[in-house]
């Protein structure tokens, strides 16, 4: 993938099975991942500030305040993470993208779709100066 540094990822989904599947899927794609997990918006907000992930995979229906409000808050960060929004509801795409998501993936799509979008974002991280090997 062109990155020789660790990639900090935050998985935010209330469902343990979804987080586990995402972690397994991403670990097969890259070996230098540091992944943390959140189960609600409060945890996600705290982890964004302290962990400073480069990439967030966010369940649009995550318990707590609306995910859109949190995405808008990301804009105030010095280094906004890339965000892939996941939802079981395809109709949520417009709202997620308007709130600042970089990518929207419906949970009903094949895992390959998520991997394609993941690769695109990771390559973008490497080309915008955030990769320390450049």
Locate predicted features.
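Two-component/phosphorelay signaling modules centered on CheY-like receiver
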Residues: 16-36
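Alpha4 helix (beta4-alpha4-beta5 surface) of REC/receiver domains from two-component response regulators
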Residues: 69, 89-105, 109, 113
């Amino acid at each position: 993938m062109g990155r020789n540094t660790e990639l900090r990822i935050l998985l935010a989904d209330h469902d343990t099975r979804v987080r586990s599947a995402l972690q397994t899927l991403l670990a097969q794609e890259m070996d230098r991942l540091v992944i943390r997990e959140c189960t609600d918006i409060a945890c996600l907000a705290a982890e964004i500030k302290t962990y400073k992930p480069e990439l967030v995979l966010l369940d649009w229906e995550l318990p707590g305040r609306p995910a859109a409000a949190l995405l808008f808050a990301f804009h105030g960060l010095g280094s906004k993470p890339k965000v892939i929004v996941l939802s079981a509801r395809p109709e949520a795409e417009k709202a997620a993208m308007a709130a600042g998501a970089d990518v929207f993936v419906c949970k009903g799509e094949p895992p390959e779709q998520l991997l394609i979008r993941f690769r695109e974002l990771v390559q973008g991280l490497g080309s915008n100066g955030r990769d320390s090997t450049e």
